Amino acid sequence: MIINQPTKRQIFLLLFLLTEMGGAHAQFFTTGQDPASLRWQQIQTDHFQVIFPEGFEPKAQYTTNILEHAYGLAGRSLDHKPRKISVIIHNQTVISNGFVAPAPHRVELFSVPPQDNLDSPWLEHLAIHEFRHVVQIDKLDQGLTRVLGYLFGEQANALVAGMMPMWYFEGDAVIAESALTRNGRGRLPSFSRNIRARLADSVPLFSFDKMLMGSYRDNTPNHYELGYHLTSYGRKQYGAGLWQNVQNHVGQRPWQLFSFSLGLNRFSGLYSGSLYDSAMTWFDEYYHTGNKGMS
């Protein structure tokens, strides 16, 4: 048997690849990190499948009750009741967050409260906020989006949801948590401090693009704060059905390149940038008058 000896070129290539591997970093996932020994239980209701670690049943039942109570309320302004969904609760983590995944369709909640927690219970606040995202995404399942769902499954909703701005998703969810809990972020003066401070300054207001994308030089609000102001202004000026109509437009016309902005213009006469200008003008007067005499 003849064994070919490695050439200098092959040895050099191998050493180069081994050297480069030293700079590789593994990916860290916030889900799927639960101990393998963890046993799971579930609670089944008409609208939810709540999956939770063994021993967490009291908090899981509490969360289930909150979700069932919010089911008819959180979707009222969008005129939508979503299909049944799985809710997975993680308690073996230090992360304080939650998210909704369109595919496979589910909610994941991390039960450890943040250090700067609100006065309302963390799981109550988190469950309502994330369930509003469920309503938003499930609302898109209509028209052409539903047809695409037969071809691409749940990925179709994820694709169409990507056409909608993050400020809408998060701002609208903050409205829901503020309306359905005792102390949602929209009720806190500190939540709007970045925009209030900017409006109180004598310099011109930042452009919509800068407020949307952020800045390394200037302090700008995140999409939660910006979105809360824009979505609440839209509801106040054009009715609670504005965002329902916009979502209907996006779900039925996902082929339009700027479907969200076109839908917003169709039902309010404003595009996203002009909505921002109008909202900041209104809030400037609202904050400077001490909230008096505004309607």
Annotate each PLM feature:
Residues 54, 243-247:
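Short hydrophobic alpha-helical segments that form membrane-spanning helices or hydrophobic packing faces
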Residues 13-14, 24, 180:
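Cleavable N-terminal signal peptides
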Residues 1-12:
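Bacterial N-terminal signal peptides that target proteins for export
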Residues 19-23:
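N-terminal signal peptide c-region/cleavage motif recognized by signal peptidases
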Residues 30-35, 121-126, 134, 139-232, ...:
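Acidic/His/Gly-enriched intrinsically disordered linker/tail segments
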Residues 26-159, 165:
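Juxtacatalytic substrate-recognition/specificity segment
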